[in-house]
Amino acid sequence: MRTTLFLLFAFLLSMSSACERPSRTEVARAATLTGGGNARAGQTEIRKYGCNTCHEISGVPGARGLIGPRLDGIGERYYIAGELTNTPNNLMLWIQHPRQVESHTAMPEMGVTEQDSRDIAAYLYTLR
């Protein structure tokens, strides 16, 4: 019984840290980087466009995808999809038109608007 309770507690603790909201400082930095992207809206838009189906993304319930890469720490990576230098404009381009960048990518064109790509990029840049 103790083992079961311990495991349950450990699981709940890990889930609460995965759902932490970005700090105000992180949100402000992400908005500056992306030219006005709204990180909080981006967190919602990730689910709207189904990004959580393929990717594991902190703070997004159910985002435990096994197809695309884990998106935590994307702001610290040198390249996006192994093709583009990691800049806010390139991340927004990738989010909107992945097949224009890499024609053989598994990532589909989802019809993401420019503003939504800005918001999603802002959220992704808050992830550690």
Can you describe what each PLM-predicted range is?
Residues 20-47:
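Electrostatic cytochrome c docking/interface patches
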Residues 22, 57-60:
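Cys/His-rich metal-chelating microdomains
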Residues 53:
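Short, cysteine/histidine-rich loop/knuckle motifs that typically chelate Zn2+
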Residues 1-4:
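Positively charged n-region of N-terminal signal peptides that target proteins for export
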Residues 6-12:
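Sec-dependent N-terminal signal peptides
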Residues 15-18:
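C-terminal motif of bacterial Sec signal peptides marking the signal peptidase cleavage site
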Residues 44, 62-128:
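Extracytoplasmic electron-transfer domains, predominantly the class I c-type cytochrome c fold
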Residues 50:
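The −1 position to Zn-ligating cysteines in a subset of zinc-ribbon hairpins
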